[in-house]
Design a protein with these regions (language model features):
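Active-site beta->alpha loop and helix N-cap motifs at the rims of alpha/beta catalytic domains
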Residues: 125-257, 484-640
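N-terminal amphipathic alpha-helix/helix-capping segment at the start of soluble metabolic enzymes
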Residues: 53-101, 366-369, 375-497
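N-terminal chloroplast transit peptides
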Residues: 1-16
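Beta-strand/loop-dominated core regions that host nucleotide or nucleotide-derived cofactor-binding catalytic loops
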Residues: 533, 805-808, 816-839
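Catalytic alpha/beta core domains of metabolic enzymes, predominantly
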Residues: 196-209, 240-388, 394-395, 402-419, ...
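Hydrophobic faces of well-ordered beta-strands that scaffold small-molecule active sites
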Residues: 97-103, 128-130, 157-161, 178-180, ...
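Short, acidic/polar
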Residues: 108-119, 164-168, 322-326, 491-510, ...
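N-terminal organelle-targeting presequences
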Residues: 23-59
Length: 843
């Protein structure tokens, strides 16, 4: 058995021992004192570093030098990072993407920690993190490790360290990886005063970091440990804040101060992380980190990255936010380990991680290189061979290895190989209906779409398309349009469809549009419209919804009859025909006549993203121009690729027509639906590509949500999903909420809990969400503590933060307004605080 040094003067066995409440209160007071945030002043005549006060919406646009953030945005190439060893797990260098989680019990509770670690290992965790905030926790860690080794459990453990370099040195005796936060490892425990840093003082801070951090580097180097340099948005040191502001650039420069010391001391077993509760900021931070490493990459020193959206929350909300942030980076080949930080039990984080990786394998890319296509097919045929990986790594500079993925990189193969690959594709992907479909799609793509380059997705100044105000006010929502697809049968149940489309009642009991009401609906098989369905359509139009109908002779006749029977202007104008781009001449001729009669607002065109550029260019000269485009990819797994292509084409041609994502989700299980909608659509919207979203879940049944492996925390969400249409609405609105494109409810920053948490975070979060979930645009932080700093609450309007066992501090912005509120009173006090600042609305 391994022996570890113990301090005999302390009782490191937690069982039956209670925390000293006086110590907790003392530490809490100190933390509150250190985390007080104040604006740095300015004095004339001094060489100063000014604190930058930057609005949240501008944080994406302050970066001036992102030229390349990944290997390729058109096809999958894993970022080539150094291989790092963490115990018996290797990450980076095309190794499997490692999955990790974190215990949520007190680290001094040895038995409970061991049980949690064992359960996480059994359910697929590659490593487990524990909080180590003091000497007692560090000493308890020795016993935890001994118990695990006695049962031959060698899963790597990660120590979460804040504030105390001495504790980090102790933890290195036990843990395979030490996570340090540059924002508080050295100079986090200090008074945040109106300090103006001179250049000399700023540089002296680096010497202090060297003094405290190098001993840990030397010890980890000697013991073959790894170090994660984990920066958190909102927890930067006052030095960094004074120079860079609370920005992605500040996060990266803070991390580089630590990594440069590692490199100077020839220690390369390091991992980066750039976490934020805002997926928008998190993605930009990692992209900038990669871009900066490309610039600094003289000796192949691009280090692996751990991905995570911190304080994501629980249930579908937490999953969607994480799938957006983590998935969009993995899609572009960035990331070597992941954690989905949920306000749930540690093991509940593992299944979503697996689902994300599993569904990422289905992404579709295309190639015109014979060796790539042949190699891809070979790997598919030998997917259980010695080189099989659960990931989709890149092998070398010239060969894209799509191991066990649903790639279509097969067009250049011999006829025999191509046929085998097509059969494999058809078996694996339920969205492909025949071998012939796959073959035709491949050929169509190769002839048109392999030559685009991204120039207009400007990473330095990401902005939305400018849309004609008249179109916005008349048809599209001013922020982002919400659409849905309904069938005739669903329209026959008017009460259910009103509920599913989030139509509200006014004080007189009349139907009206609300903050989350659907804006446009597409009626599937409109030609089969029944009398009862017609009545529902009429009511929806009266409320203000727009109805999209496919332009074909039978449907035109039905619409004419409807207009004859009801001559109201809304009925005439709110039905909009759409057709495929190649049929534009027919619809154009029809609409010239209709618009002259003032019978219609316009029309829409649908495209799949594979059209010839010359065909798309015709849109520019159409008169009248289409109101908007519907971008409907052949399968969701290629939607990111075709969106990037279409975005380039319409910008390069100067086409000022908005486009709406129209995505069919053919998955059966709820978790797959969540992943595919969030990942393949959210990745586009997070870059502000697109002006609306229509999600169409095609294989929904009531059993789909009941049989899926979804955590218990999602029971309340399932009650919102009573039908296929309601699921479409739920997905669309939550994706728009988490991309922060269109807010319709309260936004929560909820920590996942750890050994520092001072109350039941899961139950507390549920209760606060139940009380405040209707407050559109309000942001509430629910934190077990604020160990990473008061800025960890990000841009929350209000904060509910643990200060002592069953005691809570309440914040307005970054200002503490009430201390040590008893937990049973804190909910009412929070609502009073919200009302005081005029953010409350009655449900």
């Amino acid at each position: 058995m391994h022996q570890f040094p113990l301090n005999s003067k302390r009782n490191s066995n937690f069982e039956g021992t209670k925390r000293n409440h006086n110590i907790v209160k003392y530490e809490s007071r100190k933390r509150r004192h250190f985390f007080l945030n104040s604006r740095v002043g300015e004095k004339k005549g001094q060489s100063e570093i000014k604190r930058k006060i930057i609005k949240d919406e501008d944080k994406y646009n302050i970066i001036k030098d992102i030229k390349k953030y990944c290997e390729c945005t058109k096809k999958y190439k894993r970022l080539p990072t150094r291989e790092v060893t963490i115990g018996n797990v290797k990450i980076g260098n095309y190794n499997n993407i490692a999955i990790q989680t974190m215990t949520n019990c007190d680290t001094r509770n040895i038995e409970e920690c061991v049980n949690q670690i064992k359960k996480c290992k059994d359910l697929g965790a590659d490593m487990v993190r524990l909080t180590v905030q003091g000497v007692q926790e560090a000493e308890a860690s020795y016993h935890i490790k001994e118990k695990l080794l006695s049962e031959n459990i060698t899963i790597p453990l990660v120590a979460d360290i804040h504030f105390n370099p001495k504790i980090a040195l102790m933890a290195a005796e036990v843990y395979e990886k030490i996570r340090v936060n540059p924002g508080n490892f050295v100079d986090g425990r200090k008074k945040w005063i109106n300090k103006v840093y001179k250049k000399k003082e700023f540089e002296e801070g680096k010497l202090f970091i060297k003094e405290k951090f190098v001993p840990l580097i030397e010890k980890c180097k000697r013991l073959n440990r790894a170090i994660r340099i984990g920066t958190n948005h909102g927890s930067l040191s006052s030095r960094i804040l004074s120079y860079y502001g609370d920005t992605p650039l500040g996060m990266i420069e803070s991390a580089f101060e630590f990594s440069d010391l590692c490199i100077e001391n020839k220690f390369y077993n390091i991992v980066f992380s750039m976490k934020a509760s805002n997926a928008y900021v998190m993605i930009q931070s990692y992209r900038l980190l990669v871009a900066k490493q490309y610039e600094r990459d003289k000796n192949g020193l691009i280090f692996p990255m751990h991905l995570g959206v911190t304080e994501a929350g629980f249930g579908a909300n937490g999953r969607i936010k994480s799938y957006l942030g983590i998935g969009s980076l993995l899609y572009d080949g960035i990331g070597d380990t992941i954690r989905i930080s949920l306000t749930e039990d540690p093991w509940d984080e593992l299944a979503p991680c697996k689902k994300l990786i599993e569904n990422l394998k289905k992404r579709i890319f295309y190639t015109d290189k014979k060796e790539e296509a042949s190699y891809s097919v070979m790997k598919k045929q030998n997917k259980e061979g010695p080189n099989y990986s659960r990931d989709t790594p890149n092998n070398d500079n010239d060969v894209t290895v799509m191991k066990n993925s649903l790639s279509r990189e097969i067009q250049s193969c011999s006829p025999e190989k191509k046929e085998e690959a097509i059969i494999y594709k058809a078996k694996e992907n339920s969205t492909v209906h025949s071998d012939n479909d796959v073959y035709q799609t491949i050929e169509h793509w190769n002839s048109n779409c392999l030559n685009f380059e991204e120039n207009f997705r400007d990473f330095n100044n990401i902005v939305k398309n400018r849309v004609d105000k008249k179109v916005k006010s008349d048809v599209l929502h001013e922020e982002c349009t919400v659409g849905n697809v309904v069938t005739v049968k669903e329209l026959e149940d008017s009460l259910q469809i009103f509920k599913d489309l989030n139509i509200e009642l006014d004080q007189n009991g009349n139907l009206k549009k609300g903050a989350k009401t659907t804006d446009i609906i597409i009626i599937d098989k409109f030609e089969t419209l029944t009398d009862s369905a017609k009545k529902t359509v009429k009511k929806l139009i009266e409320i203000g919804l727009h109805v999209l109908v496919q332009h074909q002779p039978q449907n035109i006749d039905i619409v004419k009859k409807l207009k004859i029977n009801d001559s109201s202007s809304s009925y005439n104008n709110n039905i909009i025909f759409y057709t495929h781009l190649e049929n534009m001449d027919n619809i154009l001729e029809y609409y010239k006549d209709e618009m002259q009669k003032n019978n219609s607002k316009g029309y829409a065109l649908i495209l799949n993203g594979k059209e010839n550029i010359k065909m798309v260019e015709k849109i520019k000269n159409l008169d009248p121009a289409p109101l908007f485009l519907l971008l409907r990819s052949d399968t969701v797994f290629e939607h990111v690729l075709v969106t990037r292509r279409v975005n380039e084409i319409i910008h390069s041609l100067g086409i000022n027509v908005p486009y709406i994502h129209y995505v069919d989700i053919h998955s059966t299980y709820y978790e797959d639906i969540l992943v595919n909608a969030s990942l393949y659509v959210g990745t586009c919207l997070i870059d502000l590509m697109g002006d609306g979203l229509i999600i169409n879940v095609t294989n929904y049944s009531s059993a789909a949500t009941n049989t899926a492996t979804v955590a218990n925390a999602q029971k309340d969400e399932k009650q919102q999903i009573s039908s296929r249409v309601s699921l479409n609405s739920f997905l669309t609105l939550n994706i728009l909420q988490d991309t922060r494109i269109r807010l319709f409810k309260t936004d929560y920053i909820a920590c996942p809990s750890c050994g520092r948490t001072l109350f039941n975070i899961q139950e507390t979060t549920k209760k606060i969400m139940k009380l405040t979930g209707h407050l559109k645009g309000v942001k509430i932080a629910i934190m077990g503590c604020i160990v990473n700093g008061i800025g960890e609450m990000a841009d929350a309007h209000f904060g509910y933060v643990g200060s002592a066992p069953k005691k809570v501090d309440l914040y307005y912005g970054k200002e503490i307004v009430e201390r040590n509120v008893p937990e049973e009173e804190a909910y009412d006090k929070l609502i009073e605080l919200i009302k005081k600042h005029n953010k409350w609305q009655d449900p």
